[in-house]
Amino acid sequence: TYADKLHADGLQVVAIGNVGERAFLDSLVTTATITGCAYDDILVHTECGPTVEERAAHIHSFVDRFNIAVDDWSALSESERRDAVLHLLQVAGGLDIAFLTGFILGAASHRMAVVFDNAVTGAAVLAAVTIEPLVKDYVFPSAAYEEPIHKEQCRFLGIKPCLHYNLQIDEALGSTMGLSIIDASMHMLNDMKTFVEAEVKAAEDGAGKGRQKNKE
């Protein structure tokens, strides 16, 4: 797989993105099915056209015939969860989300960190985590988007994005920016000097007294 190739090339962290034209609707259905939230709660209100309620009813009329609803994901066995997610992706996931789901699973199997950003990449993360809950330890949100779908995904996963730039652009921009955060964090862990190594004088009195010893 492509994740295997990147791992063989020595990569430890990857950023994912999407370019699909229909992917937003796909991510809405995928997210609502996995988290259990109502379509009405994650549809965006618009000044013109059908109301949120009308749009939600239209989506229901199309999706419900495919029997993708799951009352309790936690009650399913591993194989049942996998089959249910595969059925969901086949019906409503779209190529972008289906491919990204497989890629995330492959990357996590190699203990590679995966940075995601918007509602579409978040839907793939939800699908991957539903198939294998341990994947959650390897996924990192990056930019905070105002999309209700994206907010619901982060709420369900229990994670918070760290970049707040009011981004409106997809195609992995937010994920790529998130790579810099991980890179900086690793430099701090591995390369940052201690006060002693940097020859910073220890406090002679006050709260910091006695916490370190300077070089003679």
Q: Which functions belong to the PLM regions below?
A:
Residues 1-216:
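N-terminal loops that bind phosphate or other acidic moieties
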